[in-house]
Amino acid sequence: MYIIAGLGNPDRKYAGTRHNIGFDVITYLSDKYGISLSKTGFKSKLGQGFIEGKKVLLMKPQTYMNLSGEAVGEAVNFYKVDETTELIIIQDDIDLEPGNIRIRVKGSAGGHNGIKSIISHLGGNEFIRLKLGVGGKPEGGDLADHVLSGFDRDTEPLIRKVIENAGAAVLAIMKEGAEAAMNKYNGMKISV
């Protein structure tokens, strides 16, 4: 089984923000593969099903970003998945421009509080991360305001393509392994 957790904040006011792009990918996968997110557990909205023959648990932690590790840690411990190969975290990344995707199999939190929480709760940093570029804050701007803001109307078609490509990247990770998916998606610049 794969646990696929998209990071975000649960309040409706955060829908469509840069920080919630992980939730958006989970919604996309749920819709594409007919996996209802109608269950709750592990402090998350959940959906269980299959993606091209692979059993998955889709998660949208409802803990707020900074406590995401509570939800992810509970699910990993319950299902006893191998966090190095069967846990996929989908996150926003301010160090990548919109249209860029990067897959990592380990590393620091890079200033991302949701990832920091997951590392703390798992007791290690070796898990697959699918990082989606949301762009850095404007010069002189506040980082929190930036990640909690929506994308510009001009950028929305690009973000829809990024979400579709992120869904394909998740499938590639499950079918071909993280290394092969990294070779395919890292460095790819998505455009409309």
Regions from the PLM with identified roles:
Residues 2-105, 116-130, 137-142, 149, ...:
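Nucleotide and nucleotide-moiety/phosphate-recognizing core
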Residues 108:
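Short glycine/threonine-rich catalytic loop with a Thr-x-Gly-x-Asp
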Residues 111-114:
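Hydrophobic alpha-helical segments within soluble ligand-binding/sensing domains
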